Amino acid sequence: MALPRDLKELNKKNIKSILRQQGAMTKAEIADVTGISVVTVNKLIRDLTESEEILEQDNSVATGGRRAISYQINPNYQLVLVVSLQEKWKKITYSFSVFNLLGEPEFVEDMSGEDLDITALKRNIKDLVCAFPKISCIVMGVPGIEIGGRLRAMDFPLLLNVHLRETVEAEVNLPVLVETDTNAAILGYKNRPVEEENIVGLYYPERFPPGAGLLMNGEILKGRNGLAGEIKHMPLQVDWDNFDFSVDEIKAHIRKMVLLTMSFYDPETIVLYTNFYFGQKDFIEELTAELKQVYPYATLPKIVLSRKFTTDYRIGLLAFGIDYLENNLTDWRI
């Protein structure tokens, strides 16, 4: 059973979440949508405006001769720093983005280079935290897996086995979330938004092995060690150290993975993230025909060929950060 203080904080959280998602609303509208009594809403709105977490709208709403004030989320009450590591056009790229609570970018900068190690990463993050003091959490996307606090199976050798979360938290004294790139991308795709609850994303960089992001029943599927989606370890007799990243070889691997994906997960949508050019319509038709031949009795997944990995990746990382802040954890080290 929730204690009164816990219930109060939960109601505040619900009000802020509704305002962030739906925009400006009056007290009566907030009460109607949340199911919280008007009396309680009045008290909570007062608290939230005093703390500047929400703002009164300048253009209040007219209601039958009276003017009912509307309220909106304060988008700059907290900021989220998103750091994404990615292979982009055959270069290793670090992207630093600062977003407000409405997902509007306050700052975006991309850096590329093979020598961007943990020291350079810490320096850039610290500079941004100093420049944007409203940053309340940092979300980092990596092409690898965090196990036991260390980055494992990393495509970027300079960060392999680094205690990334612990190191950055110690540097800036802020909560740090670390997420796999493909998990973030598939959450970003879901947040476009789309209706499907079962989505698999297959990501094919130009010089590194592929990975997968799995959204099952609306939830990211990670597995016990976070290894779900590490498709480079599939027993398909592929030597990734000497792999020829040609269009034909990538297409052949995708064909196998689409069939395996259907067998393992039976998704509603399969998103193929790649910058390789296949001739989108023809290739998707070929994949669908192959699935139909194997599963003539099944409703087949929609197959989407997308070049928007970077966009979905950032959106997904931001979604992880917003979700963290909305949960209003008081001790982020727990």
Each model region followed by its residue ranges:
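Glycine-rich phosphate-binding loop and adjoining helix at the ATP-binding site
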Residues: 105-110, 114-188, 284-293
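Short, well-ordered strand-loop elements centered on a beta-strand within folded domains, enriched
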Residues: 94-96, 105-107, 151-153, 210-212, ...
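ATP-binding/phosphotransfer module of carbohydrate and carboxylate kinases, centering on a glycine-rich
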Residues: 1-58, 62-66, 70-107, 116-127, ...
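Short, acidic Gly/Pro/Ser/Thr-rich loop/turn segments
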Residues: 88-90, 145-147, 209-210
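Short glycine-aspartate micro-motif
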Residues: 80-84, 137-139, 199-203, 211
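Hydrophobic beta-strand positions
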Residues: 98, 145, 213-214
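Glycine/GP-enriched mid-protein hinge/lid loop-to-helix segment characteristic of carbohydrate kinases
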Residues: 174-266
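Short secondary-structure boundary segments
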Residues: 142, 202-206, 274-275, 303
